């Protein structure tokens, strides 16, 4: 495969920079695996953070490393699994790299903290925009005008 497009797996995978190696998914994915699946017409590569059962449907709870929204993906929608990637010319093997395993476990464990920080960051940005608009230093954008009718 080629370089990732987007920032949902940052800081592990960098937009249009690193090169990924994805293989077909065989069997059950484990927690911390990075799954390739289809969302609409786009391919998405996100980390498995858990499993779910909904009646007869079984699947994975998935989230990007730079995301805070959990997704519930049925098993049959998973197309592949990340087996390794090249970062600045250095090969990282997702099966054997101790550093990769430590990063994966730490990143998933910090999910609640990351979610709280992203929420706080968004609130500070919104408040900052309101102050700039109130002081006349910035025009209110069309999206916020439409939401405040």
Residue ranges of model-derived segments:
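Extended hydrophobic leader/signal-anchor segments used for secretion and membrane insertion
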Residues: 1-149
């Amino acid at each position: 495969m080629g370089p990732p497009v987007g920032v949902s797996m940052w800081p592990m995978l960098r937009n249009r920079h690193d090169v990924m190696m994805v293989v077909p998914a065989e069997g059950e994915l484990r927690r911390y695996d990075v799954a390739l699946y289809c969302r609409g017409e786009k391919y998405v590569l996100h980390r498995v953070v858990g499993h779910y059962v909904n009646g007869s449907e079984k699947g994975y709870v998935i989230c990007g490393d730079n995301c805070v929204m959990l997704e519930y993906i049925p098993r049959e929608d998973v197309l592949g699994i990340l087996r390794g990637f090249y970062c600045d010319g250095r090969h990282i093997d997702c099966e054997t790299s101790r550093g990769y395993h430590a990063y994966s476990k730490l990143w998933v464990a910090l999910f609640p903290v990351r979610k709280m920080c992203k929420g706080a960051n968004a609130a500070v940005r919104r408040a900052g925009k309101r102050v700039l608009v109130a002081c006349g230093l910035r025009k209110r954008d069309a999206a916020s005008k439409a939401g405040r009718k």
